[in-house]
Curated annotation (Swiss-Prot):
It catalyses: (S)-2,3,4,5-tetrahydrodipicolinate + succinyl-CoA + H2O = (S)-2-succinylamino-6-oxoheptanedioate + CoA. This is 2,3,4,5-tetrahydropyridine-2,6-dicarboxylate N-succinyltransferase. GO terms for cellular component: cytoplasm. The lineage of its organism: Bacteria, Pseudomonadati, Pseudomonadota, Gammaproteobacteria, Alteromonadales. Belongs to the transferase hexapeptide repeat family. Its EC number is 2.3.1.117.
Amino acid sequence: MEALRQRIEAAFEARANITPSSVEPGVRADVETVINMLDKGEMRVAEKIDGQWHVNQWLKKAVLLSFRIFDNGVIEGGETKYFDKVPMKFADYDEARFRAEAIRVVPPAAVRKGSFIGKNTVLMPSYVNLGAYVDEGTMVDTWATVGSCAQIGKNVHLSGGVGIGGVLEPLQAGPTIIEDNCFIGARSEIVEGVVVEEGSVISMGVYIGQSTRIYDRETGEIHYGRVPAGSVVVSGTLPSSCGKYNLYAAIIVKKVDEKTRGKVGINELLRIVD
């Protein structure tokens, strides 16, 4: 694996000179190997080790290299056709394979090859980009998008129209991460490598990037780039330094533990007590 990593790193440094027609066969084979392993969940762009997230940057580089290596081609899509560099994940699936992997895919959901979809996952008409990892028991609801290399935990609900940012456009240092047992409300956007920690509930229409202030109203603490575990978050504002206007912020209105979250419905958690 170390030898593969070194070859990917070297190819990435020379990426400006790589085209579909000029790429060396060995480099193409290495990138295909990585994409296939990501597709099967044998490797992932980010993984949690001893409570900390670690990004495997070389895997992300392989994903980026794939766009320089693979040429556009026609992709059959039932009633229509597409023309793109990345094939669709389920292009060769039959009923037996769908049943074996225990996933449900509602048309016209689009999932690119190189993304992993865990068992008992439901994909409504949604989009999952390559390099993404969607763990077991997760619901990706209608028109939700999971960006390139994003990491989605177990038993997560991404509501309708949710956007989980990727790392390709614009190029980001680390993937956006939604940990286990989180609920992301409709039309919310979590981007730029933000980590939403386990058991958090994000209300409808909350936008969080690295520069977004995440204000805990109980403690007065302001977080950036991280929603603490068990947070219930709504959109709001905080006063500017001059006091003349307010600026957007995400507000942590309460904290809940796993026991409370299991007993109380999501709608009840989102009711703000002044």
